[in-house]
């Protein structure tokens, strides 16, 4: 049985999970203007789209093809620069160190035996002052 959000992602005009989270919005004043941000398990992009709209460099990935297709549609429509991938966190093609990595509502869906490996990868991908 597929998760409910797979069908929700097909509606390209409505955010599946609403506005960006309060926690992500609160981090914005602490970011450099040229901050590099990674959104892990980005869903339909509520955080990636918001942050790219503020001018940050954003990479985002999710397992869901529907989610990434929705982000790609919205980034084109709004002329935003977001690099997207359809992949698992363990298969992400690491590009560079990030100032901020968002993992919002994702860890609980990762196999518990793989969570320590994922945490180590996230630490490795984060800048020293990130």
Give residue spans per PLM region.
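Conserved SAM-binding motif I beta-strand of class I
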Residues: 57-62
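Conserved class I S-adenosyl-L-methionine
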Residues: 1-32, 34-43
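Conserved SAM-binding strand-loop segment of SAM-dependent methyltransferases
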Residues: 78-89
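A short glycine-rich, Lys/Arg-flanked "PGG" loop and its adjoining helix->strand segment in the class I
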Residues: 116-128
């Amino acid at each position: 049985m597929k998760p409910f959000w797979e069908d929700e992602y097909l509606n390209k005009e409505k955010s599946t999970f609403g506005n960006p989270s309060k926690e992500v919005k609160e981090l914005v004043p602490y970011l450099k203007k040229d901050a590099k941000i990674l959104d892990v398990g980005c869903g339909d992009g509520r955080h990636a789209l918001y942050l790219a709209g503020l001018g940050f460099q954003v990479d985002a990935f999710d397992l869901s093809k529907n989610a990434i297709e929705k982000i790609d549609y919205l980034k084109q429509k709004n002329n935003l620069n977001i690099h997207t991938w359809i992949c698992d966190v363990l298969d992400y093609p690491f590009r560079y160190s990030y100032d901020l990595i968002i993992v919002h509502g994702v860890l609980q869906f990762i196999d518990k035996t793989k969570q320590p490996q994922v945490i180590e990868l996230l630490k490795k991908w984060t800048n020293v002052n990130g």
